Amino acid sequence: GRQRQMCIRDRWGTSLIDKFKSDMERNPEKWEYLGDRSESRDKQYMAAGGISHRYFFNSDASLKTTVAATYSQLDGGASMFNHALESTPYMDLESRHTNLILTSTFNRKFSNRFTNKTGFTYTAMFYDMNLAIPLYSSAASDVYKRQAPYEAQLLETVSKGDGNTSLISAYNSSSVGLSDRWTLNAGIYGQYLTLNNKWSVEPRAGLKWQATPKATFALAYGIYSRMEKMDVYFVKTKSTGNQSVNKNLNFTKAQHIMLSFGYKISDRMNLKIEPYVQFLHDVPVMADSSYSVLNRSDFYVEDALVNKGRGRNIGIDITLERFLEKGLYYMISGSLFDSRYRGGDGVWYNTKFNRNYVINGLIGKEWMLGRNKQNILSINLKLTLQGGDRYSPIDMEA
């Protein structure tokens, strides 16, 4: 007879508002740093929501489709004060982004040893953004530059965009059981950005070996790429006027190689060890400068960039986890790593994320309370030990 078909629907949504204000020191005699005589304000609004639909053709085939929307808004500004407490603006930022997302995935189980997943994602991106900062220009340079202390300098627009574009991606991946102990996962992923007609094709594969009932080994390799934040594509420089100098930037690309060892110590405890290496190329950098988008920390980018940067991450992750039993659980994880990048000047630097080590400990205890043991009292503790932030020493002689 006919197999029963089933549909599952799911809805979700979330939002947040974040506001920040920093006031200046009103007594000029107490000014020691540039920040003492500046004021700033930032307001961020974010919202996301969607609906998912899963249709089961039969027990071996299903189609999941999701429609979602996201919205983000950032309004920021900052002013600098002189000793007469007269203010001069040195940043004005307005940014609004709306994404409409359609994604669909078809899963098919051909046999106990062969499954396939095929899907696509279409993202329509609507943007309206404007960044203005005080600039001066040098006759010997094609690039606008900011110059402290920003007083008596008019705001100039360095990034402005209003329109829409699309990011389209598709993939196909399969899982094949080569034997009772060996499993191969392989696939291909591709994406296309209509803003500048840039595209990428990325193969990915992984091999898993069940060495013993308690021990597994795995090796994975893949190529991954990403577009930049939208404001990067709409930076302008002195000689180009209103023309965007970064609009033809290519994707940043990375090759990932990872080994994995997993060991089941007991029914409630697992150990996992994962060494990895990541090589990045086509990273946007500023020519003849140490600047790279890998180190981006500001709300904005103000320079012309080229895809000539590189990056390298190497490290090992170790995790020991005890699942909840008799009300007790804990997890200890540690990472040792080195993260570096090569700027537009050809020199290798530490990234701002290169803390070299991070150790996390999490432990929790639960008690069942009440007449029918339906209430839960829990105590949880998390500890983190990590390396410090990277910084550039001040050149006192300069």
Report the location of each language-model feature:
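Flexible loop and strand-edge segments within Gram-negative outer membrane beta-barrel domains
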Residues: 9-56, 60-63, 69-97
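Gram-negative outer-membrane beta-barrel transporters
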Residues: 277-279, 300-391
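Outer membrane beta-barrel strand-and-loop segments of large Gram-negative receptors
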Residues: 95, 99-103, 159-163, 246, ...
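Transmembrane beta-barrel strands of outer-membrane/channel proteins
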Residues: 9-15, 65-71, 118-124, 186-190, ...
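Short, small-residue-biased leader/transition segments that mark boundaries at the very start
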Residues: 1-8, 133-144
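Surface-exposed extracellular loop regions of Gram-negative outer-membrane beta-barrel proteins
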Residues: 18, 22-26, 62-91, 162-194, 214-257, ...
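Short loop/turn motifs that connect adjacent beta-strands in outer-membrane beta-barrel proteins
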Residues: 56-62, 109-115, 181, 214, ...
